[in-house]
Swiss-Prot record:
Lineage, opening ranks: Bacteria, Pseudomonadati, Pseudomonadota, Alphaproteobacteria, Hyphomicrobiales
Keywords: Kinase, Nucleotide-binding, Serine/threonine-protein kinase, Transferase
DNA-binding is among the record's keywords: no
UniProt name for this protein: Putative pyruvate, phosphate dikinase regulatory protein
Positions contributing to ADP binding: G153, V154, S155, R156, T157, S158, K159, T160
Length: 273
């Protein structure tokens, strides 16, 4: 017999990509660390036949059902089948949409994937992603002034994943490594437009991450001091000094997720929101 205290099935049914549901489901599941959610994601469910196949899967692995289905008939079928199976279900967006309708005094469009319209904002994200990929790890330093954000930091401070996350929000982001003894490009030091932010982490954390990175490679490829905590501490001291000298804010990413780091960066300049 399945032990719900250890794990549970989480069924995510969407008529679009399922991204909204996945984010909501994971945010809720993260509050229950003693139980592991086994995710079952069903995107692009838009007709009765597809839905019935999904509900058969739910019947075979009972658990929590979350859904975002704008078609009222299909949503009603989910509620009905969940009652028959004996599992709880929640329409994630309905309470929010109803609140909006009540406050704004107008009905919603009830359109699948309405947040994924290929509008100006969509193309701005594509442009930001292209810019960010072209300016990863110090590439094309001559046009740093075209960036919204430039991240600087020693190796393994999550510069690249944070840059990509910001780019997905339409924020053009470049990043460049800080290496003691290697001067930063003049174009960066003279840039006036971008928000320049330094990323740091504890020497212990960086040593652990770097040790994982060198697995399968030779230590000499990275340098003998790459994972040495004392050497890393000196790198961090240099990075802090460099950022202080240029009045660049510092963010410690030791205990931050990529999302939390990105939120802290955006908070430094509200116009990025």
């Amino acid at each position: 017999m399945e032990n719900r205290k250890n794990y549970f099935h989480l069924h995510l049914i969407s008529d679009s990509t399922g991204e909204t549901l996945i984010a909501a489901g994971r945010a809720a599941a993260a509050q229950f660390q003693s139980s592991h959610a086994l995710e079952h994601v069903y995107p692009l469910i838009r007709n009765r036949k597809q839905l019935m196949q999904v509900m058969d899967a739910v019947d075979g692995a009972p658990g929590i059902v979350l859904y975002t289905i704008v078609d009222r008939e299909l949503a009603g079928l989910i509620d009905q089948r969940c009652r028959e199976i004996g599992v709880p279900c929640v329409s994630v967006l309905d309470p929010i949409i109803e609140l909006f309708q009540s406050y704004l005094g107008s009905p919603s469009r009830r359109r699948s994937g309405a947040q994924h319209v290929m509008d100006a904002e969509y193309f701005a994200r594509i442009e930001a992603l292209n810019f960010t990929m072209d300016h990863d790890d110090g590439q094309v330093p001559s046009d740093f002034n075209e960036a919204d954000v430039v991240l600087v930091g020693v190796s393994r401070t999550s510069k690249t994943p944070t840059s990509i996350y910001l780019a997905n929000r339409g924020i053009k982001t470049a990043n460049i490594p800080i290496v003691p003894g290697v001067p930063l490009p003049d174009a960066l030091l003279k840039a006036t437009k971008p928000l320049i932010v330094g990323l740091i982490a504890s020497a212990e954390r960086l040593s652990q991450v770097r040790q994982h990175r060198v697995l399968g490679t030779t230590q000499s490829f990275h340098g003998e001091d790459y994972t040495d905590r004392a050497a890393i501490a000196e790198e961090l001291k240099y990075a802090r000094s460099l950022c202080a000298r240029n009045n660049w804010p510092l963010i410690d990413v030791t205990r931050r997720s990529i999302e939390e780091t990105a939120a802290a960066i955006v908070a430094l300049r509200p116009r990025l929101r």
